[in-house]
Structures are given as structure tokens and as C-alpha cells.
């Protein structure tokens, strides 16, 4: 299944890496550099199916976007995967409690990401 994926990451090289990989897998990639860009990307039609979200976006916390998305009924279908260098139990617990559906630590395991995307049932891209 192919998906529309919003990538929110302030590291331009990592954003481009994810974009290239997603497109090579047949997915559509939408890129956002800042938290503000992420808010625009998540609310713009056509809506994404999945958000790959860096947690530390400069001085801002990506979990702010997660909290907002989870309060929006029309975005209930959107899956959010944190992509982060954070890997302590406390960090992972706060990521899960915020409403992320899963978490990938950097550097990302592309096999695990492929399996995750394949497991999702609501594709937008045909």
C-alpha cells in the first residue's frame, strides 16, 4: 500500500534522505522543516496518512503537533511516527503518552519503516 507521508524534520539532509527513500518505495512525500510547516502540512488537503515527526525541531517540541492532531476529529486516521535520537525510557514513554503510534530512533531502520508502512490499511496514493 502506498501512502501520503508528511516528513517533519529540521535536518535538511535527513528530510531529503527520507523523501528519496519514501518515493523509491512508491509513497508520496511532503516535506516540512519547522513545527509551523508541520501544522500547515497536516492541515492541507489532501491530508497525509502518516507523519514522520522529529521530536526536537530547533527550540520547539514536535509533541506539540501530536497533541494538536489528536484533538482534531478529521485527523483521527493520521498515523504519527516519532523519528528521534531520543531513546531513554522516559523519552519513549512521553512520546507514547503524547499520542504517537510508534517511534523510530535515528538512524532509522528502513526495513522496520517499510514494515510499518505496509501494515497501515488506509492508503491515499494509488
Q: What kind of feature is each model-predicted range?
A:
Residues 11-15:
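Short acidic/polar segment at the start of the alpha1 helix of CheY-like receiver
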Residues 64, 87-104, 115:
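Alpha4 helix (beta4-alpha4-beta5 surface) of REC/receiver domains from two-component response regulators
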Residues 54, 84:
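Active-site residues of response regulator receiver
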Residues 31-50:
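Acidic, metal-coordinating helix/loop segments flanking the phosphotransfer/catalytic sites
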Amino acid at each position: 500500500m502506498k501512502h501520503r507521508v508528511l516528513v517533519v524534520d529540521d535536518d535538511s539532509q535527513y528530510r531529503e534522505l527520507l523523501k528519496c527513500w519514501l518515493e523509491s518505495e512508491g509513497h508520496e512525500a511532503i516535506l516540512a522543516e519547522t513545527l509551523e510547516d508541520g501544522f500547515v502540512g497536516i492541515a492541507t488537503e489532501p491530508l497525509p496518512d502518516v507523519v514522520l515527526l522529529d521530536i526536537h525541531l530547533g527550540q520547539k517540541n514536535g509533541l506539540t503537533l501530536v497533541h494538536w492532531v489528536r484533538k482534531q476529529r478529521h485527523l483521527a486516521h493520521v498515523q504519527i511516527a516519532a523519528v528521534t535520537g531520543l531513546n531513554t525510557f522516559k523519552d519513549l514513554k512521553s512520546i507514547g503518552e503524547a499520542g504517537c503510534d510508534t517511534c523510530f530512533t535515528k538512524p532509522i531502520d528502513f526495513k522496520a519503516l517499510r514494515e510499518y508502512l505496509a501494515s497501515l490499511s488506509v492508503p491515499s496514493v494509488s
